[in-house]
Amino acid sequence: DVNWPLGWPVGGYPG
């Protein structure tokens, strides 16, 4: 996912 913090580092970015 593209979400923070759950989407990072699992397929997203800290933003």
Swiss-Prot record:
Keywords (A to Z) from UniProt: ATP-binding, Chloroplast, Ligase, Nucleotide-binding, Plastid
Protein name: Probable glutamine synthetase leaf isozyme
Presence of the UniProt keyword Lipid biosynthesis in the record: no
Compartments it resides in: Plastid, Chloroplast
Catalytic activity line of the entry: L-glutamate + NH4(+) + ATP = L-glutamine + ADP + phosphate + H(+)
Misc remark: On the 2D-gel the determined pI of this protein is: 5.7, its MW is: 42 kDa.
GO cellular component annotations of the record: chloroplast
Keyword ATP-binding belongs to the record: yes
Annotated signal peptide: none
Oligomeric form and interacting partners: Homooctamer.
Organism: Pinus pinaster (Maritime pine)
Record GO terms (molecular function): ATP binding; glutamine synthetase activity
Family: Belongs to the glutamine synthetase family.
EC number per UniProt: 6.3.1.2
Function comment: The light-modulated chloroplast enzyme, encoded by a nuclear gene and expressed primarily in leaves, is responsible for the reassimilation of the ammonia generated by photorespiration.
Predominant subcellular localization, coarse grouping: plastid
Domain of life the protein comes from: Eukaryota
